[in-house]
């Protein structure tokens, strides 16, 4: 949309890995993100974005990106079937071990 105007463009960078920005246009496009240094040397991000679809509905995605990767959340994303009980139990065991500091190299 060539006629879209910028409504918000705010940026803050602390210079130490902490930052925040927010951007919005008159045609319904919006994004915001904050970043912090991660405990394992990575950058951690948390944010969201939205934009209008051709049918007039709004697509919206929020996300976290950290040492566990990019984790989006949206009603637009497909959802797989639930994990079988035995797989769920294995995931719980793995999470317990991770919390205890157990690693397998």
From Swiss-Prot:
<dbReference type="Pfam" id="PF00379">
    <property type="entry name" value="Chitin_bind_4"/>
</dbReference>
<dbReference type="GO" id="GO:0062129">
    <property type="term" value="C:chitin-based extracellular matrix"/>
</dbReference>
<keyword id="KW-0193">Cuticle</keyword>
<dbReference type="GO" id="GO:0008010">
    <property type="term" value="F:structural constituent of chitin-based larval cuticle"/>
</dbReference>
<dbReference type="InterPro" id="IPR050468">
    <property type="entry name" value="Cuticle_Struct_Prot"/>
</dbReference>
<dbReference type="InterPro" id="IPR031311">
    <property type="entry name" value="CHIT_BIND_RR_consensus"/>
</dbReference>
<protein>
    <recommendedName>
        <fullName>Cuticle protein AMP2</fullName>
    </recommendedName>
</protein>
<dbReference type="InterPro" id="IPR000618">
    <property type="entry name" value="Insect_cuticle"/>
</dbReference>
<feature type="region of interest" description="Disordered">
    <location>
        <begin position="1"/>
        <end position="21"/>
    </location>
</feature>
<feature type="domain" description="Chitin-binding type R&amp;R">
    <location>
        <begin position="16"/>
        <end position="81"/>
    </location>
</feature>
């Amino acid at each position: 949309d060539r006629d879209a105007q910028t409504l918000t463009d705010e940026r803050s960078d602390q210079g130490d890995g902490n930052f925040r920005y927010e951007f919005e246009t008159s045609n319904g496009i919006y994004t915001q993100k904050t970043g912090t240094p991660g405990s394992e040397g990575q950058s951690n991000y948390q944010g969201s974005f939205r934009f209008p679809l051709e049918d007039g509905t709004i697509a919206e995605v929020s996300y976290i990106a950290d040492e566990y990767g990019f984790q989006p959340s949206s009603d637009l994303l497909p959802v797989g079937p639930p994990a079988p009980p035995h797989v769920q139990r294995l995931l719980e065991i793995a999470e317990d071990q991770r919390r205890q500091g157990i690693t397998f190299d």
